[in-house]
Swiss-Prot record:
Record Gene3D superfamilies: YVTN repeat-like/Quinoprotein amine dehydrogenase (2.130.10.10)
Predominant localisation class: cytoplasm
Tissue specificity as recorded in UniProt: Ubiquitous.
Gene: Wdr83
Name of the protein this chain belongs to: WD repeat domain-containing protein 83
WD repeats: 23-62, 65-104, 107-146, 151-188, 190-228, 231-272, 275-313
Subcellular localization, as worded in the UniProt entry: Cytoplasm; Lysosome; Nucleus
Length: 315
């Protein structure tokens, strides 16, 4: 007799708080996982960038060199370098191991809201309130960007990179997708100022959050609206959104102190996770596991699924 095929495990959502870390760097403007999810970065209003092991709750290194608050950061694919951007209008390339500044890229006319490496970590992309996305060659000694994308009519709030494509969300209410191979740009008009954009992990869709307290899932190639997700509050702050590690759920920060999870296909609210009484400023989802980082005030919170048991106890 043949045994029935085991059903695929239903996705679990991270709702067990494992750790709260006081980052001691003023307000945490952004929290980001590194490429494999073992470490995380926090961006502080005190001009510092910090590298942590979030499960152990240990601070590994502090990076100092910005002249104003740090607003975003990212790690390279090989964990050797970091990039960051901030209120001082600069983009900084860091050596992870030494903590030293490798390069400072200047040229933006306003604060840098968002930074990303390309997949090879040879180029840093930065988006600024000056309405431009700039591409900086990490290996060149030239101070100018190798490319400037200036189609936006208002500040850039979010930049994401996938293979040969750049996704840029703007306060002008448009998401622009640049195909670098074809030299083409396509634009989807949402209307409300955009706070965050991201690609789905399968690369087929884009997720967009905006200041009308709505998230929208679009077909990447056609711009067709595939889903809308509401219930959270996002009316005045630049808040993060993302998809869960298996593209099963849409996840968003909220101004009412919660993180909201919706079923991607059904659009139904799956969980409103209470974090605290203030705005959930930033979040990051683990690349392969049901694990979430949130930032509120001066601390970050580390969340796992209910069934998770840390090695050696939860600490």
């Amino acid at each position: 007799m043949a045994f029935p095929e085991p059903k695929p495990r239903a996705p679990e959502l991270p709702q067990k708080r494992m750790k709260t870390l006081d980052c001691s760097q003023g307000a945490v403007r952004a929290v980001r996982f590194n490429v494999d999810g073992n470490y995380c970065l926090t961006c502080g209003s005190d001009k510092t960038l910090k590298l942590w092991n979030p499960l152990r709750g240990t601070l590994l290194r502090t990076y100092s060199g910005h002249g104003y608050e740090v607003l975003d950061a990212a790690g390279s694919f090989d964990n050797s370098h970091l990039c960051s951007g901030g209120g001082d209008k600069t983009v900084v390339l860091w050596d992870v191991a030494t903590g030293q500044v490798v390069r400072k890229f200047r040229g933006h006319a306003g604060k840098v809201n968002t930074v990303q490496f390309n997949e090879e970590a040879t180029v840093i992309l930065s988006g600024s309130i000056d309405s431009s996305v700039r591409c900086w060659d990490c290996r060149s000694r030239k101070p100018e960007p190798v490319q400037t994308l200036d189609e936006a009519r208002d500040g850039i709030s979010s930049v994401k990179v996938s293979d040969h494509e750049i996704l840029a969300g703007s306060v002008d209410g448009r998401v622009r997708r640049y195909d670098l191979r074809m030299g083409q740009v396509s634009s989807d008009y949402v209307g409300s100022p955009i706070t965050c954009t991201c690609f789905s992990r399968d690369g087929q869709c884009t997720l967009i959050s905006s200041l009308d307290s709505t998230l929208r899932l679009l077909d990447k190639d056609t711009g067709e609206l595939l889903g809308e997700y509401v219930g959270h509050k996002n009316q005045q702050y630049k808040l993060d959104c993302c998809l869960s590690e298996r593209d099963t759920h849409v996840v968003s920060c909220s101004e009412d102190g919660k993180v909201f999870f919706w079923d991607l296909v059904e659009g139904a609210l799956a969980l409103a996770l209470p974090v605290g009484s203030n705005v959930v400023q930033s979040l990051a989802y683990h690349p392969t596991e049901p694990c979430l980082l949130t930032a509120m005030g001066g601390s970050i919170q580390y969340w796992r699924e209910e069934t998770y048991e840390a090695e050696g106890g939860a600490g």
